[in-house]
Structures are given as C-alpha cells and as structure tokens.
Amino acid sequence: MYAEERGYGSFDNVIQAYEQIISQSLHLKRFEFDNGCFIEFLADSGTCETFSKGWISMIYWTSETDSMGSLTVDIGMDEGKCRTYRARGLLLCSKSITSISQNTEGRERILTVSHENGKLQITFVTIAKVSSEPELRNLGDLKFMEKFEKECRALDRKKHDDEHRKRSGKQKEKRKVEDIDKKKEDEKRKQEEKKRNDEDKRPDKKDEFDEPPKEKRQKSHHETKRNLEEQSHEDGIAPTSTTFVNGAVEGALSPCVSIDNHEDQQHDELDKRVYAQGTNREGLSNEDNYGNFQLNKSLEQLRARLVASSGEVVERSLSKLKERLDYVKDNLIKNVLECADVTVPSKCLSKTKHIEQKKQIVFSDCVRSVPVCEIKPFIDMRVFETETTQNARRVRQRTRTTVGSTDGAIGQQRVISGQNRGRARGRGRGRVPRRRNSNLNNLRTQNSAIVIDDSSETENFENAGSFNEDLLATTILETL
C-alpha cells in the first residue's frame, strides 16, 4: 500500500456560523474564515493555493450504531473558486474531530475534519493497495521492489492518461465550437463578397434609363399619339378637309396663328444636350426626360404634317377663291356701273389720321405683313354666304356714299359703319362734298351692295355664321 493522493488544508479565524441537526443521524455545520491555505500532492509533485475570506460547509450522516457514516466537505471562496471532498465508510467522531475511512476496489480513502481554537484542519488521503499481505512481508526483496515500482508507474500513467483524456475531450468540444463559429463567419464573408460582386456587375442606373424597353417605348409612343389626336379633335383642327363651312375654308389657319419651328428646335436641342448629361433643366429624372423627348418629337412630327397639309389646303383653297374672285369682280363692276352717277376722285372719308391696319398670316416659317385695307373694300361678303345661314348680319342704317371717278368710267359706293373711320389706301386727303340725290334711296334698296361691317363677328374664326374677312382679303392679295 502507498499514499497516492494527499491533501492538507488549514484555515484561520474560523467562526461557526450555524449548526443544524436535521435528524438524529444527519447534521449540518457552516463555518466562515478570513484566510486559508490548501496543499495537494500527486505522486512526486504538489501544489499550494491560498484563499482569503470564504466559507466551509460540512454535512455528515451517522448510522444507528454510530459505526458507519458519510462526510461531505464543500469549500467556497469569494474569488469564485470552490472545492469539494467526500468519503463514505467507517465513522470516527468526537467533539472536535470527525473522520471517515472508505475502502473500495483496493483503495482506501480517509477524510478528516478538526475544528479547535479558531482553526480548522482538513486532511484528505487516498491509499492504494498494490500487493497482497504475503508479498508485503518481503519488502527487502529487489524483485518485489521492482514490481512494486512498475505497478506504481502504471497507476500514475493510467491516472495521467485519464486526466489527459478528460482535458482533450474538453479541448475537442472547444475546438468543435470554434470550428462551427469559423464556418459561420466564412459563409457570411462569402455571401457579402458575392453580393458585392453582383453590385459591381450590375449596370448603372443611368444606362438602364438610356434605352427603355421596346414595349415601354411603343406604349409611350401610342399614348402620345392618341393624346395628340384627342387634343386636335377638341381644338377643332381638321387639316385634311377642303370644304367650305359657313363661308370659311375648313382647316385654314387663323391670321394670328404663327408656326415657327426655330424656337422649338432650339428647345429640343437644349433638351437633348441636357438629357445626354443625365439631368434636365427642371431637375427631372432620366425617365421623365425620355418621355418629354418623345413628346417633343411627336409634336414636331405633327407640326410638320400640319404645315404640309395646310399648304396643300391653301393651294386648293386659292384656286377655288380665284374662280370666285373673278365672279366677284364681275359683280363688282356691274354694281358700280349701275350705281355710279358722279365721277370724282376717290378720297378717304376718315377725319382722323390714316392708319393702315396690318395683320399677319403665317402658313410656315415665313412671316409677311399684308395691308388689309387695300383689298377689303372690294369684297362682297354676301357672295360667300350659304343658303343655310340663319343669322343674317345686320346692316347699319347710317351710311356714307361717295361716288367719284377721274375718268367717269367707274363709280364706287361704300357703306361704312361708324366704327371704321380709316381712309382707303391710295386716296388723296381732299374732301368731296356729300351729295344726296334720288340715287341714294335706290342704292339702299339694292341687294347687290358691297357691305363691310367691322362690328359683326367676322373676325371670329370659330363663329358658325361668320367669315374671316382679313383672311380672305390677304389670300386674294397674295393670289393677285
């Protein structure tokens, strides 16, 4: 037999906190100490450990005969360390000493606790039984000593292997946990790298908006075309028609309408340059810029078609107007010859300064000024009136008649409203006295008189029962 493990503990300033007798055979004691020291020996090596402030709990059980029992000692320190020792077997108990001797599988374990004069001692010893009693008698034999040492080394090696196996198991579990954490980190890093590569391969947003999908372009084009057609129907534009409606050519442009592509082209070029830079003047997005560019392009195409169709309509209208102009001239000469009595020079009847009223008609980018007063007095508007006109224009009763001619061959008559006081172009500034005779009453009853009434709604191109005199006058002048 030999002492395999030894442990010795000594504690100072020990105070018994309490003692509890749970039953006649079960007791519990608790002690507190200020400092202590514990020394352990294993084979040929030992360790020493000191403590400061802690507690000791001692639980022991005794049988009815007080010959058997068990003892458990727990030591706890304020630093968070703890130790425990236990033994079960023969019991030796006194007032200050409690000792247990346990014999199992060739090993004997002894645990002793003593408390006296403020000190507490703990002794823990394990004794290994190697050989039988007859062999112990021959301790002086060399062979026996070699065998004994060999067995001791085997026991030490076994204990060392057990401890190593225990430590390696803990390390293996620790490495397993570390491997799992490392694997998770690697997967997370790979996912981040993959996501970053996908973002690098993805094209820029600007390139995505530069060329929208074909379906989107077709849809935008059809929507723009449909909106333009609806707007043209609402505005009453019918550029392909050449019929006369209430004396006006349907599809003809108003004198105040001007189509100038120069300014729009400048704006389109500016929009294209700004769109190429990725931003618009109003700060719109690329998608909005593309929509505006398509809309401007559609408007430009519509404008070009409108100008081309308007030119064709005007040419056809002029050809028809020329035929009607010949008819108007014949009626004009006939009416003047019938109504003329006195031949005097033609003069302006206006008392105010002569102001030539000029209006513009624009069919393309070319703009030309036309004096309306040169051709306006020679138009008989009743020739262009249709039979279905229900709102006949009223002719004012107050008229002024001037009949004059230098050669006496042709006379002229005018019925001028009070609102138009300008003199005709090409007349002298002299005044001709008004002559009232019997022809005046006859002139009022004639139906072929040439009437120009600025008070009527002739300037309104959209009125159903009116006709644009300025447009007709300008068209006739261009034809002549």
UniProtKB/Swiss-Prot annotation:
Residues 156-241, 417-438 are annotated as: Disordered. Keywords: Host nucleus. Residues 422-437 have a biased composition (Basic residues). GO terms for cellular component: host cell nucleus. Residues 156-165, 175-215, 225-236 have a biased composition (Basic and acidic residues). InterPro entries: U79_P34. The keyword Ribosomal protein does not apply. The keyword Electron transport does not apply. It is found in: Host nucleus. Belongs to the herpesviridae U79/UL112 family. May be involved in DNA replication. This is Protein U79. It comes from Human herpesvirus 6B (strain Z29).
